[in-house]
């Protein structure tokens, strides 16, 4: 019942942009949250620039997450350490708790650590998809203690969040630390397969897992062409 409510509440009933990741292991479809507009628009921009095409899932940790978006991974040699390839700007954190949190299937932005990045601004390109594990009350209480220290008591695991972490799974210790800006709506079996793959000492899969192509399949926020531009498009089509 909780899962149905999470997906059908007014917060998630709005039309959302969607992106399809075609990977060597199967397809993953992602819906982007309107509540994180800066991250949503940036992800759409990076996808539109085709920067994700041919990049690896360069960091994979079982029962935790799978990460991609390192711009240096496109032509990386086997065994090379990855994780530093990024664009030259960052995005202001958009924490939206308790609505958006690190449940299984959440898509979040990677970033530099707190010492170099105390505002917890997101990197512009690298992202991860949460797998995580299921938690019990005792372990969630310990996570809450840690979050209280890291966030000066501003991040609280609500009963609704706790229920999801206990029944579905996720990574609650990342809440309030990294911006969640989307969710996987198709292809969780692909994520499960990737997160179980054998990795090297750098957490890179021993067999390359690659995003073949990233495509915007739905974007209700794309600007509508002006009438004159539509006519020009029609003329071009007629000339062909």
Predicted regions and their residues:
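Bacterial N-terminal signal peptides
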Residues: 1-10
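Cyclophilin-like peptidyl-prolyl cis-trans isomerases
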Residues: 11-240
């Amino acid at each position: 019942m909780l899962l149905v409510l999470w997906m059908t509440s007014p917060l998630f009933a709005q039309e959302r942009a969607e992106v399809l990741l075609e990977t060597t292991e199967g397809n993953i479809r992602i819906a982007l949250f309107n509540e994180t507009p800066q991250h949503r628009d940036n992800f759409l921009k990076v996808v539109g620039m085709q920067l994700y095409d041919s990049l690896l899932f360069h960091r994979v940790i079982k029962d935790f997450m799978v990460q991609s978006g390192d711009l240096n991974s496109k032509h990386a040699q086997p065994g090379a350490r990855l994780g530093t390839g990024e664009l030259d700007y960052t995005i202001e954190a958009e924490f939206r708790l308790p609505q958006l949190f690190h449940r299984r299937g959440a898509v979040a932005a990677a970033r530099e650590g707190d010492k170099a990045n105390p505002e917890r601004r997101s990197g512009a390109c690298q992202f991860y998809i949460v797998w995580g594990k299921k938690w019990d009350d005792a372990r969630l209480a310990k996570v809450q203690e840690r979050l209280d220290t890291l966030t000066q008591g501003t991040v609280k695991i609500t009963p609704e969040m706790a229920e999801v972490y206990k029944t579905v799974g996720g990574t609650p210790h990342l809440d309030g630390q990294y911006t969640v800006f989307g969710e996987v709506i198709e292809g969780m079996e692909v994520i499960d397969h990737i997160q179980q793959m054998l990795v090297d000492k750098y957490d890179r899969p021993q067999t390359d897992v690659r995003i073949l192509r990233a495509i915007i399949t739905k974007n209700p926020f794309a600007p509508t062409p002006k009438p004159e531009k539509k006519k020009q498009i029609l003329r071009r089509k007629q000339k062909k």
